[in-house]
């Protein structure tokens, strides 16, 4: 990134609509590398650093020169990108060609380029003279999307902007694919990756490190947001290596069925969804069912003496005594004395959402826009509510998050408990969450951090003095109380194999984290930095941000104010051109956010420049919608 741009800002105000200094500095680098040099870039910016806005600002600049195709994983993230495109346009302050920008979900992109599962090679000519931006680049390999990207790269010889950060689930393999896509050379994976008998023994070898440094030199942008303006995190439970874990000791009932499932069904325990299920809750014979349709067809079937299922509805005293789930027993007991909103991560597997719904209802918590809980708990005269988000939930997710994140819900009075499967681990932002729970151990510690990052991020909290509580729950045997202080104590398989599933999973993640951190440090070391005057293509965007910052603190100045002129000439060296720019923003009534007047427009009044507050007003039912083509980014769902 161009550190010379960062040096232009002093005490940058982040609380207004803004482009952050590191985003502008990165934008300069992307323009120079991708547009000027026609080289691909890996934008490896850790979660919460604003990768999406950087990518969209770059797309707006690039649209003046080429077609830009943006590829996102699914419909939900496509909606986020379309919304953020509007934000980026409002901050852009320069010309762009909206018709040259196309946003695709992977499914629509597949349909566009495949006929009967075969790539339509003749149609790929549409991507000549294009730039591809790929969001969540670590997720596109090993499937048709990754195959198609490789074909387009080889056939069309175009540059890619790959967006990634955390998590890279299987780091060495994924990184190998990224190198292959970004470079002009074909990669022999056998030469750069060493493999042992286990997944945790997959490593980038020394030749791989050298290949990475040689082929991606000058093509990496690494950034991690400083840990400031965030609440402190309070981890609960006993010390476990460098974190804390809550041991939830299983009842005899849960432990018995847990062991039956482990013996009968689990051949690759680390990746077996049955173990995810029984570590969260056991359901007797239903533990062995992997089909929800079968599950919902059972009528008045007794699972345990105090638990039955009828057409997909669980009922019985066991949902309150909770011998079926040590994790939910801890959770239900703990939340009774806690204030604020909760975010609870779980793996849906087969029956996770089903168990959660009926445990919550049976213990007095009501379903948001659904069934009321038994003897409902109340807040401000209204029932305490929960919602469950899974991959099947699409159309109503944005509306649900609007309610959850609204200022009126800061105390959880509208929606207190948000349960989510992995669909929420990336891209979404949650606000004012005071309690984060892990009912399932995530697949990687990067994913663990990503889930935390949905909530614990800049601008998500009004009061950062109050801590955020994190509970990582592990189902353990009734007599298990091991202190886990060093990975070196668990290097032998026979010692690991006897451990509870959740503890094994945590150790597995920690072993993987070593390799992940090693690769991250290499990427950080390779990140390109320089100090140059801003690229001509971003000058107006940069000046717009400098003007916004200046008029946040200045409500009224003389037209020939020396400080304003000095700021503009730090970018536009010619004083006459700088004065012309000031004339343009004043006569064009540039939009700013002022600390006194809030949303304002610049005006000339006598010999002064003043900030004039404004408010949009309208008569009921007289909204006008502008359908002019140039204002609409072309996208495919």
Curated annotation (Swiss-Prot):
Subcellular location as annotated: Virion
EC code(s) of this entry: 3.6.4.-
Main location: virion
Domain called Helicase ATP-binding: residue spans: 32-185
Transmembrane parts of this sequence: none
Protein family per UniProt: Belongs to the helicase family. VETF subfamily.
Quaternary structure, from the entry: Heterodimer of a 70 kDa and a 82 kDa subunit. Part of the early transcription complex composed of ETF, RAP94/OPG109, and the DNA-directed RNA polymerase.
Protein name (Swiss-Prot/TrEMBL): Early transcription factor 70 kDa subunit
Species name: Variola virus
Species lineage: Viruses, Varidnaviria, Bamfordvirae, Nucleocytoviricota, Pokkesviricetes
Gene: OPG118
């Amino acid at each position: 990134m161009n550190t010379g741009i960062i040096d232009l800002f002093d005490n940058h105000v982040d609380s207004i609509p803004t482009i952050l200094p590191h985003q502008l500095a990165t934008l300069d680098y992307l323009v120079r590398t991708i547009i000027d040099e026609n080289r691909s870039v890996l934008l490896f910016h850790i979660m919460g650093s604003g990768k999406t806005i950087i990518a969209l600002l770059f797309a707006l600049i690039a649209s003046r020169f080429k077609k830009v195709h943006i590829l996102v994983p699914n419909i939900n993230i496509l909606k986020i990108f379309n919304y953020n495109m509007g934000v980026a346009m409002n901050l852009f302050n320069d010309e762009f060609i909206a018709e040259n920008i196309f946003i695709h979900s992977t499914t629509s992109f597949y349909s566009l380029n495949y006929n009967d599962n075969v790539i339509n090679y003749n149609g790929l000519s549409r991507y000549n003279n294009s730039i591809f931006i790929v969001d969540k680049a670590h997720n596109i390999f090993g499937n048709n999307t990754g195959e198609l990207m490789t074909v387009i790269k080889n056939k069309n010889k175009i540059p890619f902007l790959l967006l990634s950060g955390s998590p890279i689930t299987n780091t060495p393999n994924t990184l190998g694919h990224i190198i292959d896509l970004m470079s002009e050379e074909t990669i022999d994976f056998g030469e750069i990756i060493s493999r042992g008998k286990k997944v945790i023994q997959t490593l980038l070898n020394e030749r791989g490190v050298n290949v990475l440094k040689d082929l991606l030199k000058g093509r990496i942008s690494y950034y991690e947001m400083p840990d400031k303006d965030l609440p402190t995190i309070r981890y609960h439970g006993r010390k476990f290596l460098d974190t804390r874990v809550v041991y939830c000791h299983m009842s005899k009932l849960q432990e018995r069925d847990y062991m039956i499932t482990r013996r009968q069904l689990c051949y690759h325990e680390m990746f077996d969804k049955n173990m995810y299920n029984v570590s969260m809750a056991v359901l007797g014979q239903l533990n062995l069912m992997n089909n929800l349709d079968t599950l919902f067809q059972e009528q008045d079937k007794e699972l345990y003496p105090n638990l039955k299922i009828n057409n997909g509805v669980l009922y019985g005293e066991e949902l309150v005594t909770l011998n079926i789930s040590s994790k939910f027993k801890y959770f239900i007991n703990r939340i009774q004395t806690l204030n604020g909103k909760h975010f609870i991560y779980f793996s849906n597997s087969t029956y996770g959402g089903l168990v959660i719904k009926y445990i919550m209802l049976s213990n007095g918590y009501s379903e948001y826009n659904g069934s009321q809980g038994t003897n409902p708990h109340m807040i401000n005269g209204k029932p305490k509510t929960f919602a469950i988000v899974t991959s099947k939930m699409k159309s109503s997710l944005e509306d649900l998050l609007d309610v959850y994140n609204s200022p009126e819900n800061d105390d959880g009075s509208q929606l207190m408990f948000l349960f989510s499967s992995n669909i929420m681990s990336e891209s979404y932002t949650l606000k004012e969450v005071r309690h984060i729970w892990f009912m399932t151990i995530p697949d990687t510690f990067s994913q663990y951090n990503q889930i935390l990052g949905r909530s614990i991020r800049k601008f998500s909290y009004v009061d950062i003095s109050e801590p955020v509580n994190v509970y990582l729950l592990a189902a353990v045997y009734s007599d298990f109380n091991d202190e886990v202080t060093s990975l070196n104590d668990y290097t032998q398989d026979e010692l690991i194999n006897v451990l509870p599933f959740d503890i094994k999973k945590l150790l597995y993640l920690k072993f993987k984290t070593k390799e992940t951190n090693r690769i991250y440090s290499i990427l950080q070391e390779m990140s390109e930095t320089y100090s140059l005057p801003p690229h001509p293509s971003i000058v107006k965007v940069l000046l717009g941000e400098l003007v916004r910052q200046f008029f946040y603190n200045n409500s009224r100045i003389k037209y020939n104010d020396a400080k304003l002129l000095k700021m503009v000439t730090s970018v536009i060296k010619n004083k006459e051109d700088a004065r012309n720019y000031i004339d343009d923003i004043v006569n064009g009534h540039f939009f700013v956010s002022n600390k006194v007047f809030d949303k304002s427009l610049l005006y000339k009044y006598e010999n002064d420049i003043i900030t004039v507050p404004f408010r949009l007003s309208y008569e009921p039912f007289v909204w006008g919608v502008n359908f002019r083509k140039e204002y609409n980014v072309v996208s495919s769902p």
